[in-house]
Amino acid sequence: MYYGFDVGGTKIEFGAFNEKLERVATERIPTQTEDYSLLVNDIASLIAKYDAEFGVEGKVGLGIPGMEDAETGALLTSNVPAAKGQFLRKDLEAKIGRSVKIDNDANCFALSEAWDEELKDSPSVLGLILGTGFGGGLVFDGKVFSGYSHVAGELGHSRLPIDAWFHLGEKAPLLECGCGNKGCIDNYLSGRGFELLYAHYYGQEKKAIDIIKANEAGDADAVEHVDRFMELLAICFANLFTCFDPHVVALGGGLSNFALIYDELPKRLPKHLLSVARVPRIIKAKHGDSGGVRGAAFLNIK
Protein backbone atom coordinates (compact mmCIF):
# COMPACT_ATOMS: atom_id res chain seq x y z
CA MET A 1 0.00 0.00 0.00
CA TYR A 2 1.28 3.47 -0.93
CA TYR A 3 0.38 6.51 1.18
CA GLY A 4 0.71 10.00 -0.25
CA PHE A 5 0.43 13.32 1.59
CA ASP A 6 0.09 16.64 -0.23
CA VAL A 7 1.08 19.09 2.51
CA GLY A 8 -0.22 22.54 1.60
CA GLY A 9 -0.46 25.87 3.34
CA THR A 10 -4.07 25.38 4.46
CA LYS A 11 -4.81 21.65 4.12
CA ILE A 12 -3.17 18.25 4.02
CA GLU A 13 -4.61 15.79 1.54
CA PHE A 14 -4.03 12.09 2.14
CA GLY A 15 -4.42 9.34 -0.42
CA ALA A 16 -3.88 5.58 -0.21
CA PHE A 17 -3.12 3.58 -3.36
CA ASN A 18 -3.04 -0.17 -3.79
CA GLU A 19 -0.46 -2.20 -5.72
CA LYS A 20 -2.38 -1.51 -8.94
CA LEU A 21 -1.94 2.22 -8.18
CA GLU A 22 -5.68 2.61 -7.70
CA ARG A 23 -6.79 5.16 -5.11
CA VAL A 24 -8.62 3.40 -2.30
CA ALA A 25 -8.83 6.10 0.39
CA THR A 26 -8.92 9.89 0.64
CA GLU A 27 -8.93 12.24 3.60
CA ARG A 28 -8.30 15.95 4.09
CA ILE A 29 -7.39 17.74 7.29
CA PRO A 30 -6.38 21.35 8.09
CA THR A 31 -2.65 22.08 8.11
CA GLN A 32 -1.24 23.06 11.50
CA THR A 33 0.34 26.42 10.70
CA GLU A 34 1.99 27.20 14.03
CA ASP A 35 2.56 24.07 16.12
CA TYR A 36 5.11 21.76 14.50
CA SER A 37 4.57 18.88 16.91
CA LEU A 38 0.85 18.89 16.10
CA LEU A 39 1.67 18.86 12.39
CA VAL A 40 3.81 15.74 12.81
CA ASN A 41 1.20 14.11 15.05
CA ASP A 42 -1.60 14.79 12.55
CA ILE A 43 0.31 13.05 9.75
CA ALA A 44 1.34 10.16 12.02
CA SER A 45 -2.27 9.72 13.19
CA LEU A 46 -3.53 9.37 9.62
CA ILE A 47 -0.83 6.79 8.92
CA ALA A 48 -1.80 4.79 12.01
CA LYS A 49 -5.50 5.02 11.12
CA TYR A 50 -5.05 3.59 7.63
CA ASP A 51 -2.46 1.01 8.71
CA ALA A 52 -5.16 -0.36 10.99
CA GLU A 53 -7.83 -0.16 8.30
CA PHE A 54 -5.77 -1.96 5.64
CA GLY A 55 -3.86 -4.26 7.97
CA VAL A 56 -0.48 -3.30 6.48
CA GLU A 57 2.19 -0.68 7.03
CA GLY A 58 1.87 1.63 4.05
CA LYS A 59 4.87 3.19 2.34
CA VAL A 60 4.81 6.91 3.06
CA GLY A 61 5.59 9.81 0.73
CA LEU A 62 5.22 13.54 1.36
CA GLY A 63 4.87 16.32 -1.19
CA ILE A 64 5.70 19.78 0.13
CA PRO A 65 5.82 23.33 -1.27
CA GLY A 66 9.57 23.56 -0.75
CA MET A 67 12.51 21.22 -0.43
CA GLU A 68 14.88 19.56 1.98
CA ASP A 69 18.35 20.97 2.49
CA ALA A 70 20.48 18.31 0.82
CA GLU A 71 23.07 18.38 3.62
CA THR A 72 21.05 18.83 6.81
CA GLY A 73 17.57 17.62 5.89
CA ALA A 74 16.01 20.84 7.21
CA LEU A 75 12.88 21.89 5.35
CA LEU A 76 13.00 25.03 3.22
CA THR A 77 9.42 26.25 2.87
CA SER A 78 7.46 29.45 3.32
CA ASN A 79 3.95 28.08 2.71
CA VAL A 80 3.99 25.72 5.71
CA PRO A 81 5.42 27.99 8.43
CA ALA A 82 5.20 25.40 11.22
CA ALA A 83 7.60 23.16 9.27
CA LYS A 84 10.07 25.83 8.16
CA GLY A 85 13.58 24.84 9.20
CA GLN A 86 12.31 21.62 10.78
CA PHE A 87 13.42 18.05 10.03
CA LEU A 88 10.01 16.79 8.96
CA ARG A 89 11.10 13.61 7.22
CA LYS A 90 13.44 12.54 10.03
CA ASP A 91 10.98 13.43 12.78
CA LEU A 92 8.14 11.58 11.08
CA GLU A 93 10.35 8.53 10.52
CA ALA A 94 11.17 8.48 14.23
CA LYS A 95 7.48 8.81 15.07
CA ILE A 96 6.18 6.00 12.84
CA GLY A 97 9.21 3.70 12.79
CA ARG A 98 9.67 3.43 9.03
CA SER A 99 11.31 5.31 6.18
CA VAL A 100 9.59 8.31 4.58
CA LYS A 101 10.14 9.84 1.15
CA ILE A 102 9.78 13.58 0.67
CA ASP A 103 9.95 15.81 -2.38
CA ASN A 104 8.86 19.11 -3.84
CA ASP A 105 5.18 19.26 -4.80
CA ALA A 106 6.01 20.13 -8.42
CA ASN A 107 8.18 17.02 -8.66
CA CYS A 108 5.26 15.04 -7.25
CA PHE A 109 3.00 16.54 -9.92
CA ALA A 110 5.43 15.39 -12.63
CA LEU A 111 5.73 11.93 -11.10
CA SER A 112 1.96 11.57 -10.95
CA GLU A 113 1.68 12.28 -14.65
CA ALA A 114 4.60 10.01 -15.51
CA TRP A 115 2.83 7.09 -13.82
CA ASP A 116 -0.40 7.69 -15.69
CA GLU A 117 -1.43 4.55 -17.57
CA GLU A 118 -0.84 6.27 -20.91
CA LEU A 119 2.61 7.66 -20.07
CA LYS A 120 4.17 5.08 -17.76
CA ASP A 121 6.27 3.61 -20.59
CA SER A 122 7.67 7.01 -21.61
CA PRO A 123 11.40 7.19 -20.78
CA SER A 124 11.18 10.86 -19.74
CA VAL A 125 8.34 13.14 -18.72
CA LEU A 126 8.71 16.84 -17.98
CA GLY A 127 5.90 18.27 -15.85
CA LEU A 128 5.48 22.05 -16.01
CA ILE A 129 3.06 24.06 -13.87
CA LEU A 130 1.78 27.37 -15.22
CA GLY A 131 -0.15 28.47 -12.17
CA THR A 132 0.33 31.20 -9.59
CA GLY A 133 4.01 30.43 -10.13
CA PHE A 134 5.96 28.50 -12.74
CA GLY A 135 7.84 25.34 -11.87
CA GLY A 136 8.13 21.72 -12.71
CA GLY A 137 9.84 18.41 -12.37
CA LEU A 138 11.64 15.88 -14.54
CA VAL A 139 11.01 12.14 -14.35
CA PHE A 140 13.39 9.61 -15.90
CA ASP A 141 12.25 5.99 -16.13
CA GLY A 142 9.58 6.53 -13.49
CA LYS A 143 11.88 8.28 -10.99
CA VAL A 144 12.11 11.96 -10.09
CA PHE A 145 15.44 13.57 -10.93
CA SER A 146 16.14 15.96 -8.03
CA GLY A 147 19.81 16.67 -8.63
CA TYR A 148 22.78 17.15 -6.33
CA SER A 149 21.13 19.78 -4.11
CA HIS A 150 17.45 18.86 -4.62
CA VAL A 151 16.88 21.92 -6.83
CA ALA A 152 16.69 20.28 -10.29
CA GLY A 153 12.96 20.96 -10.54
CA GLU A 154 13.19 24.63 -9.60
CA LEU A 155 12.89 25.62 -13.25
CA GLY A 156 11.09 28.84 -12.41
CA HIS A 157 14.29 30.22 -10.94
CA SER A 158 16.29 29.98 -14.14
CA ARG A 159 16.59 33.37 -15.86
CA LEU A 160 14.93 34.57 -19.00
CA PRO A 161 17.18 33.73 -21.97
CA ILE A 162 18.63 36.62 -23.96
CA ASP A 163 16.41 36.01 -26.99
CA ALA A 164 13.39 36.25 -24.70
CA TRP A 165 14.57 39.68 -23.56
CA PHE A 166 14.90 40.81 -27.18
CA HIS A 167 11.46 39.41 -27.92
CA LEU A 168 9.88 41.37 -25.05
CA GLY A 169 11.44 44.56 -26.41
CA GLU A 170 13.20 47.56 -24.93
CA LYS A 171 10.34 48.17 -22.51
CA ALA A 172 10.63 44.69 -21.00
CA PRO A 173 10.20 44.75 -17.21
CA LEU A 174 12.97 43.30 -15.04
CA LEU A 175 10.80 41.68 -12.38
CA GLU A 176 12.16 40.89 -8.93
CA CYS A 177 11.53 37.35 -7.69
CA GLY A 178 10.71 36.18 -4.19
CA CYS A 179 13.97 34.20 -4.22
CA GLY A 180 15.89 37.50 -4.23
CA ASN A 181 17.04 37.41 -7.85
CA LYS A 182 15.72 39.29 -10.87
CA GLY A 183 14.54 37.97 -14.20
CA CYS A 184 13.42 34.51 -13.00
CA ILE A 185 11.05 32.98 -15.54
CA ASP A 186 8.61 32.23 -12.70
CA ASN A 187 7.52 35.86 -12.92
CA TYR A 188 6.95 35.77 -16.68
CA LEU A 189 5.58 32.33 -17.62
CA SER A 190 3.17 31.88 -14.70
CA GLY A 191 -0.46 32.91 -14.70
CA ARG A 192 0.63 35.79 -12.50
CA GLY A 193 3.27 36.72 -15.08
CA PHE A 194 0.70 36.59 -17.87
CA GLU A 195 -1.30 39.22 -15.97
CA LEU A 196 1.74 41.30 -14.93
CA LEU A 197 3.00 41.56 -18.50
CA TYR A 198 -0.41 42.65 -19.73
CA ALA A 199 -0.59 45.37 -17.07
CA HIS A 200 2.97 46.47 -17.90
CA TYR A 201 2.39 46.89 -21.63
CA TYR A 202 -1.20 48.16 -21.61
CA GLY A 203 -1.47 49.98 -18.27
CA GLN A 204 -4.55 48.03 -17.23
CA GLU A 205 -4.89 45.19 -14.74
CA LYS A 206 -6.90 42.20 -15.94
CA LYS A 207 -7.35 38.63 -14.80
CA ALA A 208 -5.90 35.96 -17.07
CA ILE A 209 -9.33 34.56 -17.89
CA ASP A 210 -10.54 38.02 -18.99
CA ILE A 211 -7.47 38.52 -21.20
CA ILE A 212 -8.08 35.13 -22.81
CA LYS A 213 -11.76 35.97 -23.43
CA ALA A 214 -10.76 39.33 -24.91
CA ASN A 215 -8.29 37.57 -27.20
CA GLU A 216 -11.02 35.21 -28.40
CA ALA A 217 -13.26 38.23 -29.05
CA GLY A 218 -10.55 39.83 -31.21
CA ASP A 219 -9.54 42.68 -28.87
CA ALA A 220 -6.36 44.14 -30.42
CA ASP A 221 -4.39 44.52 -27.17
CA ALA A 222 -5.29 41.04 -25.97
CA VAL A 223 -4.45 39.48 -29.35
CA GLU A 224 -1.07 41.21 -29.38
CA HIS A 225 -0.40 40.20 -25.78
CA VAL A 226 -1.31 36.54 -26.32
CA ASP A 227 0.86 36.37 -29.44
CA ARG A 228 3.80 37.86 -27.52
CA PHE A 229 3.24 35.46 -24.62
CA MET A 230 3.01 32.37 -26.85
CA GLU A 231 6.34 33.26 -28.43
CA LEU A 232 7.83 33.86 -24.98
CA LEU A 233 6.65 30.40 -23.90
CA ALA A 234 8.15 28.86 -27.03
CA ILE A 235 11.54 30.52 -26.47
CA CYS A 236 11.75 29.54 -22.80
CA PHE A 237 10.39 26.04 -23.32
CA ALA A 238 12.87 25.48 -26.15
CA ASN A 239 15.71 26.27 -23.76
CA LEU A 240 14.35 23.76 -21.24
CA PHE A 241 13.80 21.14 -23.95
CA THR A 242 17.36 21.59 -25.19
CA CYS A 243 18.60 20.85 -21.68
CA PHE A 244 16.32 17.89 -20.93
CA ASP A 245 15.06 16.63 -24.33
CA PRO A 246 11.90 15.10 -22.80
CA HIS A 247 9.71 12.62 -24.64
CA VAL A 248 6.50 14.07 -23.17
CA VAL A 249 5.63 17.40 -21.54
CA ALA A 250 2.57 17.58 -19.26
CA LEU A 251 1.24 21.04 -18.43
CA GLY A 252 -0.65 21.84 -15.23
CA GLY A 253 -1.85 24.96 -13.42
CA GLY A 254 -4.51 27.45 -14.44
CA LEU A 255 -2.94 28.50 -17.75
CA SER A 256 -2.77 24.87 -18.87
CA ASN A 257 -6.51 25.24 -19.57
CA PHE A 258 -5.73 27.77 -22.33
CA ALA A 259 -6.33 25.52 -25.34
CA LEU A 260 -4.41 27.77 -27.74
CA ILE A 261 -1.14 26.74 -26.07
CA TYR A 262 -1.41 23.23 -27.50
CA ASP A 263 -1.94 24.57 -31.02
CA GLU A 264 0.70 27.29 -30.92
CA LEU A 265 3.68 25.70 -29.18
CA PRO A 266 4.25 22.86 -31.68
CA LYS A 267 4.27 25.44 -34.50
CA ARG A 268 6.54 27.94 -32.74
CA LEU A 269 9.06 25.63 -31.06
CA PRO A 270 11.05 24.26 -34.05
CA LYS A 271 12.73 27.57 -34.92
CA HIS A 272 14.05 27.82 -31.34
CA LEU A 273 15.32 24.23 -31.11
CA LEU A 274 18.37 22.59 -32.63
CA SER A 275 17.68 21.47 -36.19
CA VAL A 276 17.97 17.80 -35.19
CA ALA A 277 15.71 18.15 -32.14
CA ARG A 278 12.19 16.77 -32.20
CA VAL A 279 9.33 18.66 -30.59
CA PRO A 280 8.10 16.58 -27.64
CA ARG A 281 4.49 15.64 -27.23
CA ILE A 282 2.80 18.41 -25.21
CA ILE A 283 -0.36 17.49 -23.30
CA LYS A 284 -2.61 18.82 -20.58
CA ALA A 285 -2.04 17.07 -17.25
CA LYS A 286 -4.71 14.47 -16.51
CA HIS A 287 -4.76 14.36 -12.73
CA GLY A 288 -5.22 18.01 -11.80
CA ASP A 289 -5.49 18.73 -8.09
CA SER A 290 -4.93 15.08 -7.19
CA GLY A 291 -1.50 15.06 -8.84
CA GLY A 292 0.36 16.12 -5.70
CA VAL A 293 -0.94 13.32 -3.50
CA ARG A 294 -0.57 10.72 -6.27
CA GLY A 295 3.01 11.73 -6.93
CA ALA A 296 3.87 11.77 -3.23
CA ALA A 297 2.59 8.21 -2.88
CA PHE A 298 4.46 7.09 -5.99
CA LEU A 299 7.81 8.32 -4.61
CA ASN A 300 8.04 4.83 -3.10
CA ILE A 301 7.59 2.90 -6.34
CA LYS A 302 10.80 1.01 -7.09
From Swiss-Prot:
Molecular function terms, GO-annotated: ATP binding; N-acetylglucosamine kinase activity; zinc ion binding
E.C. code: 2.7.1.59
InterPro entries (alphabetical): ATPase_NBD, N-acetyl-D-glucosamine_kinase, ROK, ROK_cs
Top EC category: transferase
Keywords linked to the UniProt accession: ATP-binding, Carbohydrate metabolism, Kinase, Metal-binding, Nucleotide-binding, Transferase, Zinc
Catalytic activity: N-acetyl-D-glucosamine + ATP = N-acetyl-D-glucosamine 6-phosphate + ADP + H(+)
Pathways per UniProt: Cell wall biogenesis; peptidoglycan recycling
Amino-acid positions noted as binding Zn(2+) in the UniProt annotation, renumbered to this chain: 157, 177, 179, 184
GO biological process, one term: peptidoglycan turnover
Pfam families the UniProt entry points to: ROK
Residues bound to ATP: 4-11, 133-140
Function (record text): Catalyzes the phosphorylation of N-acetyl-D-glucosamine (GlcNAc) derived from cell-wall degradation, yielding GlcNAc-6-P.
Family under the similarity heading: Belongs to the ROK (NagC/XylR) family. NagK subfamily.
Name of the protein: N-acetyl-D-glucosamine kinase
Recorded name of the encoding gene: nagK
